[in-house]
Amino acid sequence: MEKLIAHLKSQGFIFQGSEIYGGLANSWDYGPLGVEVKNKLKQAWWNHFVRKNPYNIGLDSSIILNSSVWKASGHIDGFNDPLIDCKKCNSRWRADKLIEEFNSEINAGVMTENQMEEFIREQNIKCPKCQACDFTQIRKFALMFKTNQGVLEDESSSVYLRPETAQGIFINFKNAQRSLRKKLPFGIGQIGKSFRNEITPGNFIFRTREFEQMELEFFFNPSDEKDWFSYWLNEVETFLQDKIQINKENYRVRSHEKDELAHYSTATSDIEFKFPFGWGELWGVAHRGNFDLNAHQEASKQDLTYLDPTTNQKVLPHVIEPSVGVERMMLAILWQAYHEEDLGEGNSRIVMKLPYNLAPYQIAVMPLQKQQNDQAQALYSNLLNNFDVTYDETGNVGKRYRRQDAIGTPFVITVDFDTPETNSVTVRERDSMEQVRINLDELEAYLKAKF
């Protein structure tokens, strides 16, 4: 992992947040190349789950919502972690994580606070920092970032940074349905920032306090006999394998046991990825029932039911939610792509084998020598009309190839001494390093076929 982090920083993918001021813990900035991968990932998700799906539409809801939303959803009262302090070194930990790291077979999420305290005491679980076995009682730690809106700083002006994008979709269910005259079943997709004041964030960008989510809430009539849960789980796997080329051996699907289910869920399956630190949740697909719409209907006193045009009966739709974090998906993609290769005879290379559609640049154009600059520049300008292209003229050809390998550029086009006479260029593919000669009249068609 450390090698990957160092590589991503040196190549302009991800930087430490606020680095010139000593950094800010758990804060990361996406550099010139990282933001390209991130935006292409989000675009791929949007195309697959919203734009190209016959059922779904999009939304962009506010980050700051009326606090009543979070009261109704249960976040204000129930969105917290069990916090415990070491009396010796004053470090703070999540009690449930201490237990689960001590014994991975235990699901501490179903234990009461008293049960967790007793287990920690009986098993003599040690503080990871100082190795002492002396902890405070567990107390609840609210995970939502709280602030004030306007000039007053009292409870009447209290607002929260959203901990998830889902609630913005639920409270806009009727607006979206009415305005576009949508009939069940249909879904609403959203990409946006969320914030959670995690006690123990970590593992690079896997768990951060500021993160981005790609969520879909799919509404359907509870009498609908189609297995929508399996449908969306299959769509998630299709996206992973076909759209962003996550290797099947690198992920697994795990269904939650009854005692693991969230209070709103009747069924949940996690897609877990084999990260460098072990298996971790990548994507969740949850059957939320009508929990959220019912909660907001009761709290707001607004009718959120759907009038079925066939039966003329009002129904409160049920919901399937596929939800994934952008940063976690980024980490999975970048980790899978990173390769150190021995080329023999003392030569090696670092290559980012990114999916072609997610690479920061699709193509690099470079002149073999300065004499070819004008023709190479003209080709570069022409290709910019249809591709994401970079121009590289610094250093010898071998170094430039390695530089493009290191950032994941799929194809490098070299304009050389023969180009003016033959009207052709050399095209090198990243993963195989194979080179072919392509006529300039056929170059664009050749490249389009690759993407």
UniProtKB/Swiss-Prot annotation:
GO terms for cellular component: cytoplasm. Substrate binds at residues 94, 164, 211-215, 321-325. It is found in: Cytoplasm. Transmembrane segments: none annotated. It catalyses: tRNA(Gly) + glycine + ATP = glycyl-tRNA(Gly) + AMP + diphosphate. GO terms for biological process: glycyl-tRNA aminoacylation. The keyword Cytoplasm applies. Keywords: Aminoacyl-tRNA synthetase, ATP-binding, Cytoplasm, Ligase, Nucleotide-binding, Protein biosynthesis. One of its GO terms (molecular function) is ATP binding. ATP binds at residues 196-198, 206-211, 281-282, 325-328. Disulfide bonds: none annotated. Its EC number is 6.1.1.14. It comes from the Bacteria. It is an enzyme of class 6 (ligase). Belongs to the class-II aminoacyl-tRNA synthetase family. Catalyzes the attachment of glycine to tRNA(Gly). Homodimer. This is Glycine--tRNA ligase. It comes from Mesoplasma florum (strain ATCC 33453 / NBRC 100688 / NCTC 11704 / L1).
